[in-house]
């Protein structure tokens, strides 16, 4: 059976930790930040853990991530 390919878009956007959690950057940080509150912008710094249903989908894009 041939090797499964990892989707390039997924490996650029997501990181899988050693414990199997899928991490991603916060959304809504591209443009239009002057409208948003400073608190909203602060909470979107760094990376966040994805929800379980979304993480399962992303994990299927990266078959050798675990």
From Swiss-Prot:
Matching InterPro entries: Ribosomal_bL35, Ribosomal_bL35-like, Ribosomal_bL35_CS, Ribosomal_bL35_sf
Listed GO MF terms: structural constituent of ribosome
Name of one Pfam family that matches: Ribosomal_L35p
One GO term (biological process): translation
CC terms in the record's Gene Ontology section: ribonucleoprotein complex; ribosome
Residue ranges, compositional bias (Basic residues): 1-15, 28-45
The keyword Ribonucleoprotein is annotated on this UniProt entry: yes
PROSITE patterns xrefs: RIBOSOMAL_L35 (PS00936)
Record carries keyword Mitochondrion: no
Keyword list, A-Z: Ribonucleoprotein, Ribosomal protein
Domain of life: Bacteria
Region (Disordered): 1-49
Family stated for the protein in its record: Belongs to the bacterial ribosomal protein bL35 family.
Classification via NCBIfam families: rpmI_bact
Listed name of the protein: Large ribosomal subunit protein bL35
């Amino acid at each position: 059976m041939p090797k499964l390919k990892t989707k390039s878009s997924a490996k650029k956007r997501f990181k899988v930790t050693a414990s199997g959690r899928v991490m991603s950057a916060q959304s809504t940080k591209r443009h239009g930040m002057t409208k948003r509150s400073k608190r909203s912008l602060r909470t979107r710094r760094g990376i966040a853990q994805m929800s379980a249903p979304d993480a399962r989908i992303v994990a299927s894009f990266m078959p050798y991530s675990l």
